[in-house]
Amino acid sequence: MYSAVTQDIQITVLPEFIPERSNADQAMFFWAYTVEIANQSEKTVQLTARHWKITDGNGRLEEVQGPGVVGEQPILKPGETFRYTSGSNLTTPSGIMTGAYRMVDENGEEFDAQIPVFSLDSPFVRRVLN
C-alpha cells in the first residue's frame, strides 16, 4: 500500500497484478489499482481532474489527463472518503505510476493532491542482484 498527504487530503493506492488479463507471451500485463481519497481537512473539497504519469519498465512515459475519476467528480466533506478501482496495462512486466488530482476547496482555491509513486510488479519481473 502506498500513501501521500497534500493539504490534509490523503491518497492511498493499492495495486494488484491481474494474471487473468495478462499474457507474457504477447507482452500484455494488466494491473488493477484501488485508490482511496480521504478528506482529513476541515473544508469540503471536490476532485475535478486527474493527471497520471505511467512509466513502463523501459522508461517510456505515458501521461493521462482528464476530468474527474471513473466518470465522477466526487465532493468530499470533512472526514469523508471516496474509493474507486481502475486499471492500467503495460507492454513490460513492471512499471511505476504517480500523478495528482486537481482539487478545489469550498473557497474556490485549487490545489494538486499528490498521488504517491507506486510500483506495478508482476511475477514475470526478472530481478538482478548486483
UniProtKB/Swiss-Prot annotation:
InterPro entries hit by this protein: ApaG_domain (IPR007474), ApaG_sf (IPR036767), Uncharacterised_ApaG (IPR023065)
Which part of the chain is the ApaG domain? 3-127
A Gene Ontology biological process annotation?
Answer: error-free translesion synthesis
Q: Which residues form a coiled coil?
A: none
Q: Which Pfam families match?
A: DUF525 (PF04379)
This chain belongs to which protein, by name? Protein ApaG
Query: Which organism is the protein's source?
Result: Methylocella silvestris (strain DSM 15510 / CIP 108128 / LMG 27833 / NCIMB 13906 / BL2)
Taxonomic lineage of this organism?
Bacteria, Pseudomonadati, Pseudomonadota, Alphaproteobacteria, Hyphomicrobiales
